[in-house]
Curated annotation (Swiss-Prot):
Residues 1-16 form the signal peptide. It is a lipid-anchor. This is Uncharacterized lipoprotein YqiH. Keywords: Cell membrane, Lipoprotein, Membrane, Palmitate, Signal. It is found in: Cell membrane. Its main location: membrane. A lipid is attached at C17 (N-palmitoyl cysteine). The keyword Lipoprotein applies. It comes from Bacillus subtilis (strain 168). A lipid is attached at C17 (S-diacylglycerol cysteine). The keyword Mitochondrion does not apply. GO terms for cellular component: plasma membrane.
Length: 97
């Protein structure tokens, strides 16, 4: 009986190990663009491929974004959620070219 319970528990435990998290299926992008500035405390505007794009900024990245000068070249890494919202993962200042 103990072996059966242990076997079932182990099978149940291991079945959860292969479940992909929601973040694994979210499309990720890395693009160069021009940082336009903050739209509000949690959104930045970046020109990507000549089009102004709004990207949501998580709390841990807000200070980093606020320190960027407007109209500077940046490399942005972001995800696109199912509802179309873009979420910033990283932003790096690039030399103007």
């Amino acid at each position: 009986m103990k072996q059966t319970v242990l076997l079932l528990f182990t099978a149940l435990f291991l079945s959860g190990c292969s479940v992909a998290s929601a973040d694994d299926s979210v499309p990720r992008f890395t693009e160069e663009g021009k940082y336009i500035g903050s739209a509000d405390p949690h959104t930045i505007a970046v020109s990507l491929n000549g089009e102004e794009t709004m990207i949501q900024v998580p709390k841990d990245k807000r200070d980093e974004c606020e320190s960027l000068p407007d109209q500077t070249h940046v490399l942005v890494k972001y995800t696109k959620k199912d509802n179309g919202t873009l979420q910033l993962e990283d932003i790096q200042l690039r030399k103007n070219s």
